[in-house]
From Swiss-Prot:
Residues 520-550 are annotated as: Transcriptional activation domain 2. SUPFAM superfamilies: E set domains, p53-like transcription factors. It is found in: Nucleus; Cytoplasm. Keywords: Acetylation, Cytoplasm, Isopeptide bond, Methylation, Nucleus, Phosphoprotein, S-nitrosylation, Transcription, Transcription regulation, Ubl conjugation. Its main location: nucleus. It comes from the Eukaryota. NF-kappa-B is a pleiotropic transcription factor present in almost all cell types and is the endpoint of a series of signal transduction events that are initiated by a vast array of stimuli related to many biological processes such as inflammation, immunity, differentiation, cell growth, tumorigenesis and apoptosis. NF-kappa-B is a homo- or heterodimeric complex formed by the Rel-like domain-containing proteins RELA/p65, RELB, NFKB1/p105, NFKB1/p50, REL and NFKB2/p52. The heterodimeric RELA-NFKB1 complex appears to be most abundant one. A motif (9aaTAD) lies at residues 535-543. Ubiquitinated by RNF182, leading to its proteasomal degradation. Degradation is required for termination of NF-kappa-B response. Polyubiquitinated via 'Lys-29'-linked ubiquitin; leading to lysosomal degradation. The modification S-nitrosocysteine is found at residue 38. This is Transcription factor p65. One of its GO terms (cellular component) is cytosol. It comes from Rattus norvegicus. Component of the NF-kappa-B p65-p50 complex. Component of the NF-kappa-B p65-c-Rel complex. Homodimer; component of the NF-kappa-B p65-p65 complex. Component of the NF-kappa-B p65-p52 complex. May interact with ETHE1. Binds TLE5 and TLE1. Interacts with TP53BP2. Binds to and is phosphorylated by the activated form of either RPS6KA4 or RPS6KA5. Interacts with ING4 and this interaction may be indirect. Interacts with CARM1, USP48 and UNC5CL. Interacts with IRAK1BP1. Interacts with NFKBID. Interacts with NFKBIA. Interacts with GSK3B. Interacts with NFKBIB. Interacts with NFKBIE.
Length: 550
């Protein structure tokens, strides 16, 4: 950058006969931000140009040809000649009225200046700051007052070092002022430091045209370009001002390389460049690749993925011989096969309105072994038997029927128990059913009195006297059952259940461990124990009903 400065402002004045000032450590030109006074914080410290994150340096001068007492004043002037006093101020230790002034150490000739910061002023306070420079005689190059009015570049300043020493006679001797390199405000995009932060890819085809997204610090879209340089070759990326996003991102296409028939990868430098001051950023490496059909680098990505997978498998603790695992245990899941037949849904039994519609020819007698008759009868007997009457007294009407000899009950020969097989009745017409099923579906409330239910009804349309009930049809049904029993000489259905037969014959059943709830008479059926009926056919129902009504 030294070739950009005029030779009339040398940093080392040609004075062979006397002392002179030399800047041995220039201030860092970019990367520092000027602070406003209203920010209420320190303006920082001006670093040296060789300053790093680990090694800090500061602006340093050397007084050649002199050792002894003296003073130094450091002030801010404009970047371009004539070097007028700048409205910005130096702040820090030993600073006043916008400049720094201190005594030099007489024992050394090299002096470093730390804790110097630059504080900027607002545009509305510009005239006031210039007037203050004139009043304090802060004008190193004695620029006339009328020339101090005008525009100022508020984004760039220079440090001016003014040193005063003693001559051999002890009188003050002012040495020639020395100017530093320009210092730019990092906040201004037209003077800020150029820096490439990140790119989405750092390689492309030698034919060019690859789209690249570049992130950077603040730039001006009309004063920025992407610069490619290589051995004997330079080019610029292709983009427009619309491709600069909010001054921090640039989308451009790579230029073609000088040799389109490239056979091996070539590395070049990629930089940001500001045409106004020819400022360049730190270079970033970019690689041009030979032109192939695989423009999207599928094979390269596949190879990289495969190598990564292999390295992971080598480091895996599960990589190695393992014992064979037993076959997985199968869990039995119930399933309905195609040959399985679903069970038919139970159908409600429809009873006929009259007993005369029942066909007794369809019924077959129920045969049980002698030892199982009482048990089966007890199992079929309900727990709560209906109470027929509160008091059961035999009347004279029932004496003839009781005097008749009981019908013989067929006894089977002892043998192995036979399983009950209910024959499937043939349905003759709708509404027909077996008498046994009809009797099983009859339900009575054990807590209600049948006589009370019949006697308490005041409806004239209902039977008021049980003697008026016509039981001739039911008597004919019973006689038909007796005739069938004598003709076939086989036990008939009407001889059961066995509980009624036991009551008729007067046989006593051994007591059960948990007897059922008894009726009023002390027996499950509400009958006395001395009543003997060998069959339900021998019972005189007319006398029984008249007994209940009385």
């Amino acid at each position: 950058m030294d070739d950009l400065f005029p030779l009339i402002f040398p940093s080392e004045p040609a004075q062979a006969s006397g002392p002179y000032v030399e800047i041995i450590e220039q201030p860092k030109q970019r990367g520092m931000r000027f602070r406003y006074k209203c920010e209420g914080r320190s303006a920082g410290s001006i670093p040296g140009e060789r300053s790093t994150d680990t090694t800090k340096t500061h602006p340093t001068i050397k007084i050649n040809g002199y050792t002894g007492p003296g003073t130094v004043r450091i002030s801010l002037v404009t970047k371009d000649p004539p070097h007028r006093p700048h409205p910005h101020e130096l702040v820090g230790k030993d600073c006043r009225d916008g400049f720094y002034e201190a005594e030099l150490c007489p024992d050394r000739c090299i002096h470093s200046f730390q804790n110097l910061g630059i504080q900027c002023v607002k545009k509305r306070d510009l005239e006031q700051a210039i007037s203050q420079r004139i009043q304090t005689n802060n004008n190193p190059f004695q620029v006339p007052i009328e020339e101090q009015r005008g525009d100022y570049d508020l984004n760039a300043v220079r440090l001016c070092f003014q040193v005063t020493v003693r001559d051999p006679s002890g009188r003050p001797l002012r040495l020639t002022p020395v100017l530093s390199h320009p210092i730019f405000d990092n906040r201004a995009p037209n003077t800020a430091e150029l820096k490439i932060c990140r790119v989405n890819r750092n390689s492309g085809s030698c034919l060019g045209g690859d789209e690249i997204f570049l992130l950077c610090d603040k730039v001006q879209k009309e004063d920025i370009e992407v610069y490619f340089t290589g051995p004997g070759w330079e080019a610029r990326g292709s983009f427009s001002q619309a491709d600069v996003h909010r001054q921090v991102a640039i989308v451009f296409r790579t230029p073609p390389y000088a040799d389109p028939s490239l056979q091996a990868p070539v590395r070049v430098s990629m930089q940001l460049r500001r045409p106004s001051d020819r400022e360049l950023s730190e270079p970033m490496e970019f690689q041009y690749l030979p032109d192939t059909d695989d423009r999207h680098r599928i094979e390269e990505k596949r190879k990289r993925t495969y190598e990564t997978f292999k390295s992971i498998m080598k480091k895996s603790p599960f990589n190695g011989p393992t014992e064979p695992r037993p076959p997985p245990r199968r869990i039995a899941v119930p399933s309905r096969g195609p040959t399985s037949v679903p069970k038919p849904a139970p159908q409600p039994y429809a009873f006929s309105t009259s007993l005369s519609t029942i066909n007794f020819d369809e019924f077959s007698p129920m045969v049980l072994p002698p030892g199982q008759i009482s048990n089966q009868a007890l199992a079929l007997a309900p727990s709560s038997a209906p109470v027929l009457a509160q008091t059961m007294v035999p009347s004279s009407a029932m004496v003839p029927s009781l005097a008749q000899p009981p019908a013989p009950v067929p006894v089977l020969a002892p043998g192995p128990p036979q399983s009950l097989s209910a024959p499937v009745p043939k349905s003759t017409q709708a509404g027909e059913g077996t008498l046994s099923e009809a009797l099983l579906h009859l339900q009575f409330d054990a807590d209600e009195d049948l006589g009370a239910l019949l006697g308490n009804n005041t409806d004239p349309g209902v039977f008021t006297d049980l003697a008026s009930v016509d039981n001739s049809e039911f008597q004919q049904l019973l006689n038909q059952g007796v005739a069938m029993s004598h003709s076939t000489a086989e036990p008939m259905l009407m001889e059961y259940p066995e509980a009624i037969t036991r009551l008729v014959t007067g046989s006593q059943r051994p007591p059960d461990p948990a007897p059922a709830t008894l009726g009023t008479s002390g027996l499950p059926n509400g009958l006395s124990g001395d009543e003997d009926f060998s069959s339900i056919a021998d019972m005189d129902f007319s006398a029984l009903l008249s007994q209940i009504s009385s």
